Amino acid sequence: MNLERLRKRVRQYLDQQQYQSALFWADKVASLSREEPQDIYWLAQCLYLTAQYHRAAHALRSRKLDKLYEACRYLAARCHYAAKEHQQALDVLDMEEPINKRLFEKYLKDESGFKDPSSDWEMSQSSIKSSICLLRGKIYDALDNRTLATYSYKEALKLDVYCFEAFDLLTSHHMLTAQEEKELLESLPLSKLCNEEQELLRFLFENKLKKYNKPSETVIPESVDGLQENLDVVVSLAERHYYNCDFKMCYKLTSVVMEKDPFHASCLPVHIGTLVELNKANELFYLSHKLVDLYPSNPVSWFAVGCYYLMVGHKNEHARRYLSKATTLEKTYGPAWIAYGHSFAVESEHDQAMAAYFTAAQLMKGCHLPMLYIGLEYGLTNNSKLAERFFSQALSIAPEDPFVMHEVGVVAFQNGEWKTAEKWFLDALEKIKAIGNEVTVDKWEPLLNNLGHVCRKLKKYAEALDYHRQALVLIPQNASTYSAIGYIHSLMGNFENAVDYFHTALGLRRDDTFSVTMLGHCIEMYIGDSEAYIGADIKDKLKCYDFDVHTMKTLKNIISPPWDFREFEVEKQTAEETGLTPLETSRKTPDSRPSLEETFEIEMNESDMMLETSMSDHST
């Protein structure tokens, strides 16, 4: 009987994915060869591929092969891992090797002529050891031990520099900081293990690591020319555009990838985040339904559905349901945790939002977004010290991100550091202009309004008006922008213009107490500036307000109480990795006001029309 021919047939059926046929012949070969270890190993492989995990593990462990051969130990542990028996899998990998293992192997070679499995089973020892480290990392991940998981992935990569799965798990899950990524790349023995492909590996690794770098034309080494159109390389470039807030260019690149490969795994999270940032709800709806139909067990499918419900608004309960399903399928899926936090943040549920963001921060140590959102929530709960600390951490990871710069400026404003706030806002504006030469995305409207607020504090009234008018171009029907312009006009003594702007603001939002109060004061001051006799021309200008002169004179006494409280508007904008729709919340803050006579002699001692904070979710 020619067993070698039957063994080749087993491998042939495995290559053709005819696993049942392969299993049948592997079982017969194992019996004919008197259960030689390599035949039992291939029998276990066939059982594993037919999802008979416990049978496969029993075939190896009942014969003690997992204690004698690294390949058998790895396969037995992988069977337990596939059956979600994580602790048993770890026990198999970490079991102590018998002292007489090498003597026994030598005996097998001498007595039975059995060859070294490294050559007979077509696997090198370094490759098997790397696979064991990789599997150990996955098990630690499943057991929520991220530190040991990270260490195991690093070891797997050092043992086998071609083990891209370990590298991808480290980078795509943001398990390393930028400095740690750099140190890892330098520590890899590329010249020792892959002399010929060293340039190729270095290019591919560096290209995937530079997500926070400024996007530039991809420079392909001559030795690997032809990778310009490779989809993984294009996705890495798109990711850099995404993290530098150039969402339109990112969308162009991801659309090209999705056209060539509609379900490209590494492109999907970036593409979904871009659709949210650009508010393409219909496209996201179509994509999410297609993903759920085709890949119901993939967390990115439910992440897409959750993002859609967050984007359309008033569907936060639905969004949480689907995002929770994504985190159940893969509890280390960071983008879903960020979006889950957004679903609470939109309802001003700060504690639940921060809990989700903290979970994301633990999972995504190398990503700045969880830190940004935690800081934002602390800012909204008036804890500026903690907010500043988290913004600083986000800034250390992504120093070029205009969203982070903007939030640091907001904290400086709240601390009364007007010059510092202006610097951060202007830096953020420069970064945005560098992306597209001019500010056109409506998500930057809060930044322009905040520049107007800080310029008003610095008594740069002309510049403040200019910034508020630019904000009106982006979002024309924003009542708070009109009231801010009216306020500046009142400070400049242009009471007629101020009255017009406050009236427009009230037309857009009738319950704006700040505009109601300021309108009354400006009308009174406008009358005071006019002649004692109110002529027909003045009456014509004021008749639209339905106030008689007596009402105007007594307006201060009627509406002064609202000075005690004023409504602040906070605009948050979400997305990650990950982008979700603009969120608006309001809160009231006590404030003491000077007398009417002092109102326009000095800039009001208000805590000011609250700076709008922008929030963007990068989903990857």
UniProtKB/Swiss-Prot annotation:
* Pfam families, alphabetized: ANAPC3, TPR_12
Example of a GO cellular component annotation carried by this entry: cytoplasm
UniProt feature, compositional bias: Basic and acidic residues: 585-596
GO annotations under biological process?
anaphase-promoting complex-dependent catabolic process; cell division; positive regulation of mitotic metaphase/anaphase transition; protein branched polyubiquitination; protein K11-linked ubiquitination; protein K48-linked ubiquitination; protein ubiquitination; regulation of meiotic cell cycle
Describe which pathway this protein belongs to, using the record's wording. Answer: Protein modification; protein ubiquitination
Q: Does the keyword Ubl conjugation apply?
A: no
The TPR repeats lie at 4-33, 37-62, 70-93, 128-159, 164-187, 198-222, 232-260, 267-294, 299-329, 334-362, 369-397, 402-434, 442-474, 479-508
Q: Which residues, renumbered to this chain, carry the PTM Phosphoserine? A: 112, 490, 560, 595
The record lists the membrane-crossing segments as none
Q: Provide the residue span(s) of the region labelled Disordered.
A: 574-599
What is the recorded post-translational modification? Phosphorylated. Phosphorylation on Ser-560 occurs specifically during mitosis.
Q: What is its main location?
A: cytoplasm
**UniProt keyword annotations, A-Z:** Cell cycle, Cell division, Cytoplasm, Cytoskeleton, Mitosis, Phosphoprotein, Repeat, TPR repeat, Ubl conjugation pathway
Subcellular location, record wording: Cytoplasm, Cytoskeleton, Microtubule organizing center, Centrosome; Cytoplasm, Cytoskeleton, Spindle
Q: Which InterPro entries match?
A: TPR-like_helical_dom_sf, TPR_rpt
Where Phosphothreonine occurs, the residues are 581, 599
Written domain comment of the UniProt record: TPR repeats 1-7 mediate homodimerization, while the C-terminal TPR repeats bind to CDC26, burying its hydrophobic N-terminus.
Function according to Swiss-Prot or TrEMBL: Component of the anaphase promoting complex/cyclosome (APC/C), a cell cycle-regulated E3 ubiquitin ligase that controls progression through mitosis and the G1 phase of the cell cycle. The APC/C complex acts by mediating ubiquitination and subsequent degradation of target proteins: it mainly mediates the formation of 'Lys-11'-linked polyubiquitin chains and, to a lower extent, the formation of 'Lys-48'- and 'Lys-63'-linked polyubiquitin chains. The APC/C complex catalyzes assembly of branched 'Lys-11'-/'Lys-48'-linked branched ubiquitin chains on target proteins.
Q: Which family does it belong to?
A: Belongs to the APC6/CDC16 family.
- Subunit composition and interactions: V-shaped homodimer. The mammalian APC/C is composed at least of 14 distinct subunits ANAPC1, ANAPC2, CDC27/APC3, ANAPC4, ANAPC5, CDC16/APC6, ANAPC7, CDC23/APC8, ANAPC10, ANAPC11, CDC26/APC12, ANAPC13, ANAPC15 and ANAPC16 that assemble into a complex of at least 19 chains with a combined molecular mass of around 1.2 MDa; APC/C interacts with FZR1 and FBXO5. Interacts with PPP5C and CDC20. Interacts with CDC26. Interacts with FBXO43.
Name of the protein? Cell division cycle protein 16 homolog
Originating species: Homo sapiens
The organism's taxonomy opens as: Eukaryota, Metazoa, Chordata, Craniata, Vertebrata
The encoding gene: CDC16
